[in-house]
């Protein structure tokens, strides 16, 4: 079963005005996956994907963190001194869906200046553009990614632009585990196909196609 973590709504079912902190246990929470997205963003490095998911789970398990759009950056401000680790925040504070995903990206290693402008975290409308500009992500918009969980990996960022965002924190789908060099050698031996078929198979398996191809080129030049 695929599960996602997200900042959802305040204790009154509203977007602002509630008490700081999670009053219901559901303001920031983990729930089952649902298909209602138009963009999936995936960190190219597996270790960064894992950190994104780790941050989201930590936030969901910290009752000091609640939902309030009008105070959406207070979690960021409190966590900055802890390396953006939400589990270390003890002061009741607030976030919203995109501010929390922004924090998860910072925790994974994205520079704050890339996602936070004028003290305000990225929104569901700006998150894709700002993450793409870092060069650290791949972006998927086809329905086999946005309307199904069959190709999703832990750490994938789900966005319905202008509305909501969440992160995959659990899935039974295969996760890329082999070193890039090992996969590149398999490519050289013809195990991953050619052309667009190769690109698709590598991407679907969770590998960074460009990184694999660069390693393939290095191997071939060395022969």
Language-model features, listed with the residues they occupy:
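Short alpha-helix capping/helix-loop boundary micro-motifs
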Residues: 138-148
């Amino acid at each position: 079963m695929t599960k996602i973590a997200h900042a959802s709504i305040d204790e009154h079912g509203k977007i602002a005005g509630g008490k700081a902190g999670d009053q219901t246990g559901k303001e920031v929470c983990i729930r089952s996956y649902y298909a209602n997205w138009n963009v999936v963003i995936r960190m190219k490095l597996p270790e960064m994907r894992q950190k994104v998911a780790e941050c989201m789970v930590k936030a969901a398990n910290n009752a000091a963190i609640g939902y309030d759009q009008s105070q959406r950056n207070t979690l960021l401000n409190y966590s900055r001194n802890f390396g953006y680790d939400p589990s270390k925040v003890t002061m009741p504070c607030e976030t919203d869906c995109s501010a929390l995903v922004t924090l998860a990206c910072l925790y994974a290693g994205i520079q704050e200046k890339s996602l936070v402008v004028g003290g305000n975290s990225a929104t569901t409308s700006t998150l894709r553009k700002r993450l793409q500009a870092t060069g650290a992500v791949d972006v998927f918009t086809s329905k086999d990614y946005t309307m199904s969980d069959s190709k999703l990996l832990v750490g994938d960022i789900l966005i319905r632009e202008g509305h909501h965002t969440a992160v995959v924190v659990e899935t039974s789908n295969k996760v890329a585990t082999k070193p890039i060099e090992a996969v590149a050698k398999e490519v050289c031996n013809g195990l991953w196909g050619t052309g667009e078929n190769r690109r698709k198979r590598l991407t679907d398996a969770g590998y960074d196609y460009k990184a694999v191809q660069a390693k393939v080129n290095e191997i071939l030049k060395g022969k």
